[in-house]
Amino acid sequence: MEKSGVARSSVYHHFGGRDGVIAALETTSTMRSLERGTAEFEAFLDTLTSGEKAFELIELGIRSFRSSENKSMRQRRISSLAASHNSAAIREVLAKEQRSGSDVVARIIEKARDNGLCNPIEPILGVAYVIQSMLVGRILVDISEDPALDAQWEDAAIATLRQILRPT
């Protein structure tokens, strides 16, 4: 803020207060982290010739989202979503980042389809948003603090994605 010459009060006002600024920054930080992860996934996907091998990678990813780091990231995303209720500026940041993230996921699915790794049964952008929704919605399992439920969610998510993506 100092370098830009914008007053702190102006930034706070734009995002609806200090919490809004924090939510916007956390959203941007979270999305950058997700982009790095998807870039690594996409690079590895380029080396695969089997849809089943690609799906094993997806399964591993889903099971790794159980980590405390990923739980914290989901908590921050949910907090940002809640903060957006009272701030058009935060909603704008969230919407932009969500569109960007979903476009990346859609591009990966499209590339996998074009490389013969999967044959999605639904429109690719819709599938990308379903995947994003599943990952954020996992917060419902997180708050239960039940490891058995965590495993059940993972199994159900994997089965759902297998049906939608249809690995070859």
Task: Give the positions of each predicted feature.
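Generic hydrophobic, amphipathic alpha-helix propensity
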Residues: 1, 25-29, 33, 37, ...
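Helix-turn-helix
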Residues: 1-25
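Hydrophobic alpha-helical connector segments
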Residues: 24, 35-72, 124-131, 154
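Amphipathic alpha-helical packing segments from all-alpha helical-bundle domains
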Residues: 34-35, 68-78, 88-115, 126, ...
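Helix-loop "lid/cap" segments that line or gate small-molecule binding pockets
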Residues: 60-68, 75-86, 160-164
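Hydrophobic/aromatic-rich alpha-helical bundle segments in the mid-to-C-terminal region
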Residues: 91-95, 99, 113-161
